[in-house]
Amino acid sequence: MLGVPIYPGAQFIRSYDAGRGQRYYIFGSAASFVDLVGFYRNVLKDKGELVYDVPATHEFDVGKYNENTMAFPPGVTIKDFQSDVSRGFPNPNPGGQPARFPTIIQIVPVVAR
């Protein structure tokens, strides 16, 4: 459905309207940032790019970006939410496990135009 694999065990959190007919999808994972980046490097056959060191954020481009028709470039972004100042991204499901996700996956699917 999204055009890229979802990391095994990742939990859907929410999708948002990105504008221009696009949506982005947020998933939480109990896996480490390093494990998620390794998974997506393998399945996408792309090394991606570390765009921020702190908090660690890694992006993979998965399609062509057309600034005339798209709000965001299609891609997969992995963000490390665990640090000295954060115990992780809160699980929005009451009583959901884990209580906090150390890592978040954001997917902007390829939209045919």
Language model region names:
Residues 1-113:
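An acidic-aromatic pocket/loop used at catalytic or ligand-binding sites
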